[in-house]
């Protein structure tokens, strides 16, 4: 694709185009990281990018960058064409979509798929080999359901969703539109509900459901459980990494982002635009406010107010955690001094 064509496409995107300086309208074949990019490749560079030192050594034919005079001056001296936008990362994401077309799966239902007679599949859907769709399930239009996926009874799947291979969607689950569910994820399995009595565990039936709104993306090997009654709810725009566990009856707001190995226990309520870093744990029935950020391995045992940044186990305000951490490594020395004082 000619560089000028890419510029036109970026102009129509969401990265907030500023200007383009094209020294040669070269054909861009693909994209690469700035430290390994070659001729006919495009890359991107942000102001705080740790790869900025590689700029003088790159062979990239074009760079997407921000409106930074130092970077633009260096690019001009190196005769490297550049596209200037407010958000280079978004522009680069759009370029990847332009340059690398998805493998096209023609609409149709594979002969090996099993679709129960009361189930309905909409227009322009791809249903791959060995897919199972249960009784009374309704599949909307333009969905891609990849091989080995099991969709049990009374499921509602909206339009334009992608369900990758070997997912399991349990009965009564509802997934709206434009969602992506990656491989081996299980949605709507039984919540972990047992009642202790006389030294044994009595099972609490899990008869609720899972509701997932539009534009949600869920990574591989995630588990989203249904509750005994009511629903587990994930609002629109939320994104989950791999190996995330969502317990029964959890409510998650809009546009949240959860990194790998996050675990949220039953009944917790997560607000909008919450960021949970890797291995964060959230306790039962805890309420986490809007715009909260929790750093990795954080243990959230009590409610967190809107806008807080928390760290540590148990979670505390990040500034308090940093102060505590600085003291922690001095504890052996402090303990030694205390023993010496005791002897006096």
Curated annotation (Swiss-Prot):
One of its GO terms (cellular component) is carboxysome. Keywords: Acyltransferase, Lipid A biosynthesis, Lipid biosynthesis, Lipid metabolism, Repeat, Transferase. GO terms for biological process: lipid A biosynthetic process. GO terms for molecular function: N-acyltransferase activity; structural constituent of carboxysome shell. Pathway: Bacterial outer membrane biogenesis; LPS lipid A biosynthesis. Transmembrane segments: none annotated. It is an enzyme of class 2 (transferase). The active site is at residue 248. Its EC number is 2.3.1.191. It holds the Pfam family LpxD. HAMAP family: LpxD. Catalyzes the N-acylation of UDP-3-O-acylglucosamine using 3-hydroxyacyl-ACP as the acyl donor. Is involved in the biosynthesis of lipid A, a phosphorylated glycolipid that anchors the lipopolysaccharide to the outer membrane of the cell. Homotrimer. This is UDP-3-O-acylglucosamine N-acyltransferase. It comes from Prochlorococcus marinus subsp. pastoris (strain CCMP1986 / NIES-2087 / MED4).
